[in-house]
A protein has these predicted regions:
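NAD(P)+-binding Rossmann beta1-loop-alpha1 motif at the extreme N-terminus of oxidoreductases
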Residues: 7-62
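NAD(P)-dependent Rossmann-like dehydrogenase/reductase catalytic/cofactor-binding core
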Residues: 10-13, 239, 247-355
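Hydrophobic anchor at the start of a short beta-strand
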Residues: 17, 39-40, 112, 154, ...
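Flavin (primarily FAD) cofactor-binding/catalytic cores of flavoenzymes
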Residues: 35, 44, 99-102, 191
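Internal alpha-helical scaffold of NAD(P)-dependent oxidoreductase catalytic cores
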Residues: 51, 105, 146-219, 225, ...
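Rossmann-like NAD(P)(H) cofactor-binding subdomain of soluble oxidoreductases
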Residues: 66-166
Length: 355
């Protein structure tokens, strides 16, 4: 029996869940799971960690209600022991950088839930044929997470709520309570059922998707174009999605991405026009990449777009629009000192001299 088929929980026992990265989303998830009866612990750092240790996590909702949950919080994973689930709520490059730190939490049956934007490192686990077991260097250089964590532990996730940290230990809920989960092998396993049950017990909406990769791509479809275009132009989401020039660039990138995804079996349940119009309806939203650029934080360019280019090379799809925007966004990131986030990916460009 493999790890996907096993759940180490005793019936009626409390589920041990560690949220690795108790930021805006991770803290929100941890508080709601703890409220629902799971035994939750948090990995955090700095002033946020100190506030959680002192006062617990507070989640504030639009209707004025609050959830305050006290639980164990630390910056030292070895304090916590083996878990039933580890929810990794970090950005893709942070998850890669801290992969070794997760190992004290991993028992024989521990599942690792990946809550990153973009294509996950385990993506080709469970595939058959020519793509079976391919490892993506753009999000997992040298296969670090693949070897340290192991793809058999992975449960895929798509995250739809929006939250923000307003002060250490305090999270503001902006909208949404839906989460999607799925196994890389598409099975409705005991462990994914138990995870969904824990989310529902905490008042969250969780659903099993046998084709979780479809959900991952649908969310990525917008992120791969809107994020870098906004970072390059400084424009908010409504402008990027309605201006004829930037809308055209976004459409071209999405068309290329759709060709890539369809070659590896992905089905899109909406068309490009509907996806772009949906982004326009969000309004004057500053994308996460634009916010990161402005605040001097590392950008998720490899996980949102670099990996798409890598997959294009794997499936032999030409991507002129993606290549152009990626090259420009990389240079913007270098200029601002927020890229690369994976030094191993940086290659020396050929230098041409002109007399």
């Amino acid at each position: 029996m493999n790890v996907v088929d096993r759940v180490s929980l005793d019936i009626g026992g409390r589920m041990n869940i560690c949220v690795f990265g108790a930021g805006a989303i991770g803290g929100y998830v941890g508080a709601m799971l703890n409220k629902g009866g799971a035994d939750v612990s948090l990995i955090a750092r700095g002033a946020h960690l100190e506030a959680i240790q002192k006062n617990g996590i507070k989640v504030m909702f639009k209707d004025g209600s609050e959830v305050v949950e006290k639980m164990e919080a630390t910056d030292t994973p070895s304090d916590l022991g083996h878990q039933d689930y580890v929810i990794v709520a970090l950005k893709a490059h942070q998850a890669w950088q801290t992969a070794e730190n997760i190992t004290p939490l991993l028992g024989p049956d521990t599942a690792v839930v990946t809550m990153q934007n973009g294509i996950p490192w385990w993506y080709f686990h469970g595939f058959e044929g020519q793509y079976a077991g391919l490892q993506l260097q753009s999000v997992d250089p040298d296969g670090k997470q693949w070897s340290i964590i192991g793809p058999e532990r992975a449960i895929g996730a798509t995250v739809y709520p929006a939250t923000e940290i307003t002060e250490p230990g305090v999270i503001k809920h902006i909208y949404g309570d839906k989460f999607g989960f799925g196994e890389p092998d598409r099975s409705e396993s005991a462990r994914v059922k138990a995870l969904i049950g824990a989310f529902e017990a905490g008042g969250l909406k969780a659903r099993f998707y046998p084709e979780i990769r479809n959900n991952i791509w649908l969310k990525l479809w917008g992120n791969l174009c809107f994020n870098p275009i906004s970072a390059l132009t400084g424009a908010t989401l409504d402008v990027v999605a309605t201006d004829s020039g930037t809308r055209g660039v976004a459409r071209a990138m999405m068309e290329e991405a759709e060709k890539i995804a369809r070659r590896i079996g992905v089905h899109f349940r909406v068309d490009i026009t509907r996806r772009i119009d949906g982004a326009a309806s969000v309004g004057a939203h500053r994308t996460s990449m634009l916010q990161d650029i402005d605040k001097g934080r590392p950008i998720e360019l490899d996980a949102l777009l670099g990996v798409v280019q890598e997959m294009a090379r794997i499936v032999d799809v030409e991507t002129p629009a993606i290549d152009t925007v990626l090259a420009l966004a990389k240079q913007r990131g270098r200029t601002q000192g927020v890229y690369p986030v994976f030094p191993e990916l940086e290659e020396e460009d050929e230098v041409l001299t002109v007399d």
